[in-house]
Structures are given as structure tokens and as C-alpha cells.
């Protein structure tokens, strides 16, 4: 199963350097947001994609489909996290039924 990253060019570059082979960079424009939506739908249909990582700022601009597979996770970009810690807690709570607290 492949990991695919969607985000700004700097975040995508970091993941490429870490060994992720399939990455897509997008600018924060209206035209690009439509391309992001199309790319997400295309990736969901592919059987070889197991995880889609998308930057939080990009995810705020598009509606992320609620699908069981592939797993879609929001990640911080070069500016830091918007709300990633809370989202991770919610994912764990839904997956295993345990709430993580500090």
C-alpha cells in the first residue's frame, strides 16, 4: 500500500526526502483547491493507496470525504499545527474506543 502526500511544496519536499514517492504540491488558490478535490477523489478510487496525508491548511479548504479506506490524515505544514493533536485524539478514540488525555 502506498502513502500519498498532498500539501504545499515545502511540506511535500520534506516527505519526498523521507522516501515518500507519490506527492502532489498545490498552491493556496481557488483553481488549485478544485484540483485538490479532484486528486483526493482519484486517490480514494485507487486500490494501491493506503494512506493519504494532507496538510491541515489545505484540508480546511476542501471537504474531506468520510471514508474508511484509504486512511486520510491531516498533518501540520511548515507553519505548524492548526489542531492536529485534537484530531489525533479523536482518531484514536474512534479506532480503539479509548480517549487520550494529558
Curated annotation (Swiss-Prot):
Subcellular localization: Cell membrane
Any one Pfam family match given in the protein's UniProt record, by short name: ATP-synt_F
GO cellular component: plasma membrane
Keyword line: ATP synthesis, Cell membrane, Hydrogen ion transport, Ion transport, Membrane, Transport
Gene Ontology molecular function: any one: proton-transporting ATP synthase activity, rotational mechanism
Gene Ontology terms describing biological process: proton motive force-driven plasma membrane ATP synthesis
Major site of localization recorded for this protein: membrane
NCBIfam families hit by this protein: PRK03957.1
Summary of the function given for this chain in its UniProt record: Component of the A-type ATP synthase that produces ATP from ADP in the presence of a proton gradient across the membrane.
UniProt subunit comment: Has multiple subunits with at least A(3), B(3), C, D, E, F, H, I and proteolipid K(x).
Protein name: A-type ATP synthase subunit F
Gene encoding the protein: atpF
